From Swiss-Prot:
This is Leucine--tRNA ligase. It is found in: Cytoplasm. ATP binds at K641. GO terms for biological process: leucyl-tRNA aminoacylation. It comes from Leptospira biflexa serovar Patoc (strain Patoc 1 / ATCC 23582 / Paris). GO terms for cellular component: cytosol. Belongs to the class-I aminoacyl-tRNA synthetase family. Its main location: cytoplasm.
Amino acid sequence: MNYPFQDIEQKWQKYWDHHQTFRTNTHSSKPKYYCLDMFPYPSGAGLHVGHPEGYTATDIISRLKRMEGYEVLHPMGWDAFGLPAERYAMTTGIHPRTTTKNNIDTFRRQIKSLGLSYDWEREISTTHPDYYRWTQWIFLQIYNSYFDRKQNKAVPITTLIQTLEREGSLFFEGVELPKGIQFTASEWKSKSRKEKEDILSHFRLVYEANIPVNWCEALGTVLANEEVEEWTSKGYSVERKPMRQYMMRITAYAERLLNDLSLCEWPPSTLEMQRNWIGKSEGLELSFHVPSLNKDITVYTTRPDTIFGATYLVLAPEHALVAELTTPEQTEAVGQYQKDCSLKSDLERTELNKDKTGVFTGAYAQLPTDPSVKVPIYISDYVLISYGTGAIMAVPAHDQRDYDFAVKFNLPIKQVIDGKMETNLAFDSKDSVCINSSSAEVQLDGKSYKDAFQTMVVWAEKKGIGRKKIQFKLRDWLFARQRYWGEPIPLVHFEDGSPKALSDSELPLVLPDLEEFKPSGTGESPLALAKDWLVYKDPETGEIGKRETNTMPQWAGSCYYYLRYIDPRNNDKLIDPELEKMWMPVEVYVGGAEHAVLHLLYSRFWHKILFDLGHVSTPEPFKKLVHQGLILGEDKGKMSKSRGNVVNPDDVVSEFGADTLRLFEMFMGPFEMSKPWSKNGVDGVFRFLNRVWRLFHSGENESFFVEDIEPNEAEQKTLHRTIKKVKDDIDSFSFNTAVSQMMIFINEFTSNPRKPKQVLEPFVLALSPFAPHLAEELWAKLGHTDSLAYHPYPKWDEKYLIDANITIVVQVNGKMRGEFLAPREIEEKEALSLAKEVEKAKPFWVGKEIKKEIYVKGKLVNIVVAG
């Protein structure tokens, strides 16, 4: 008879719910352990079998930690704002709030059916006003702050205002403030509200900017670069066009975001992805003079040592000087090219393997190191306006993209680094020296990369045409979306154009109910249609303003949810400071590698601002990060409806039980690797759990049976090895080998007629993190009246981990030729004698002169022979 998993699982899930077994006492005196999953977006499709993989892993860890005496915080919630729900509402007429609630109910039911030990009292949803009140509150904390360069941290904007009132713009002109914006303290005081706000916008960590964005007309919204591929693959077209958008000044934190990665125990690949995304480089900003305009083009280069190899300049199509540079003959071609580029995202434009395109402007610049040399000026989509200065000096001999472009447009290729050039390939080297690189202005020939770099910096700065600069690839965060289903931005615009941040007492700014979710057609979000909601009357002055109609991106709610879990029902503060100090940082964070950059970078950014402002006590939110591998279809392809290879966890739970699904997903292979689904594998794990059940039930009636007998040494060894390996493997996320060890245990005891309770009872505890329903049932049958959830994990005795016999390797002249078993305490003389009895080794030494016999205690014998 198979074990009755349906009855057992329903029974224990009801028990856990009724007794609130997994409720966290945040004020407990126990040591703390915060185990966090990346919370899911509750789609209409419900869970797929990929979701339980990560959730089961964190559940196993949480259950073990409770048994080890920790107070465990293990919560679950929903990242529920976003474009898919809004699109569904547009096609069905069903309000996103309704579909989101239904989807959450489905996800919650499915997750509960897996026996996951979440504290459901802490459940949150990013779409609930009680939650997004704090999203808006954090937004205002960021908006009302600026980055103080001297302190290298965020500071309230009121501090800056006091400085401007006292000292004017003395310390900021040319850095935060553009050159030419100068004023005294008295001049500041005389400025209008709008003028002051325009100046403050250069400092605030949230600001408005007119930038080229990815605009999707059909969706009626801006898409972030990372979203473009997703929606174009669904048939939507995207174009680039300038729009006024809210930005978050994440670039101010680039250095700290980079340096503090050293505090993170994260996968090396994820750390590297974040480093590359931040993209720190050291280079030279250098001006190229354009005689026809009597203006300069400033380029940024990380290789100023190659200046003499620059044979042309390339500007981004959006560069401000393009119109002035373009000659009448080239105007039509340049205009058409700019239009074509506006239809491409940054990701499309920078693909390394794509065909290079561009147009000559008709203008030339002078090479700074030799003004007699004229270099043509092109525009091309492989140069982005958002990086550096939006202009590059092209050195085709030593940069592959420049080389490909030069070949296509028949431009000169001049080698200036010593080395061998190969056909169709540029080459780069920082280990060689400069050649063909001297003029009356500057001499680089024979200099190393480092010396030539420094020579160029000194020369350019002395000439007043350049400066050394640290540059980052990281761009400020585009924070506005022209959508309905998102957090309203708590700002108001008055008629004079000046903004006002809502006060804390005016939060939450609740999303109004709308019947129409289609794009407004004006570039504004559907909130522009909420006429009554739009009108704002200042409670202090009575002044009438208009609410901001953009909403926040989906990333906003996930930037801090780990904090709200700690204190989810606090209506007065984001989080109680004492609880924050007790529970942060998160000990282990588990989720997909697809979030390696954006969510993790944005949440780190928000956390650092909250840290600077004194709201949190740790510089980083997540101590250890682990990514689960994908679960593929049985065809080894990614699961998708179109492939027809999606497996619904409800079906597996219905046929085999939740414990089977949990155990199988942990047994499939290494946790962090991708693995194909296997129906046969599920069957195998189900058979294993039935064997566990039958081990405790015997006779014709399969009645429960264990014996109060003393275990023998062999039984003790099997047990103690199992409980140690299971514990160690859980700690190292090696769940598959932990399951293998439990299978070894069952194999050995299935063939053993003895059923010693002293061995079987600890095994149930070791099994419980993986198969909690079955373990709870067996625990109760063993005579216990309480749940095993908080029972101490069994301890192992080292003496049972030591084998009486060991394997000793036999070498001849250092090469392995055989091995033999021997007592652990074997003496050298006996070991040498037994080594000579190993038949496999004899052909390599018998009949030869033995020069030496070496014994390495407990490991090997090496017979050294002549010849």
